[in-house]
From Swiss-Prot:
Quaternary structure note: Part of the 50S ribosomal subunit; part of the 5S rRNA/L5/L18/L25 subcomplex. Contacts the 5S and 23S rRNAs.
NCBIfam families named among the record's database cross-references: L18_bact (TIGR00060)
Protein's UniProt name: Large ribosomal subunit protein uL18
Protein family (similarity comment): Belongs to the universal ribosomal protein uL18 family.
An annotated Gene Ontology molecular function: 5S rRNA binding
Lineage: Bacteria, Pseudomonadati, Pseudomonadota, Gammaproteobacteria, Cardiobacteriales
InterPro entries: Ribosomal_uL18_bac-type, Ribosomal_uL18_bac/euk
GO annotation, biological process: translation
């Protein structure tokens, strides 16, 4: 593994530890060059409450390409809708060691605009 990926994984582990200690549900973001994934994990960290990605048919049909900011915005809106339907208004944002820039920022901004607080 290259050093850049190792450093990202280390950052993600540190963040995840702090989030788990808070006991709040968390919105975890993961990305690849072609797709972006978002999951809401319970406060104990042992159960996935909701998940959505650009692999979902609704998202893939709504966007032209799944590896851009437009698709990340759509994923952010849809994960916020799922969270609200579960009664979750406030959660912790886990960017999984990725920089808060580009697609990660677009997903977070769309989720905030749809009513989530983190």
């Amino acid at each position: 593994m290259n050093q850049k990926k190792i450093n990202r994984i280390r950052r993600g582990k540190r963040t995840r530890l702090n989030i788990r200690e808070s006991g709040k549900p968390s919105l975890i973001v993961n990305k690849t060059p072609r797709h972006i994934y978002a999951q809401i994990i319970s406060g104990e960290g042992n159960k996935v409450l909701a998940s959505i990605s650009t692999l979902n048919k609704e998202v893939a049909d709504a966007v032209h390409y799944t590896g851009n900011i437009e698709s990340a915005t759509k994923v952010g809106q849809m994960i916020a809708e799922k969270a609200k339907s579960l009664g979750i208004e406030s959660l912790a944002f886990d960017r999984n060691g990725f920089r808060y820039h580009g697609r990660v920022k677009a997903l977070a901004d769309a989720a905030r605009a749809a009513g989530l607080q983190f």
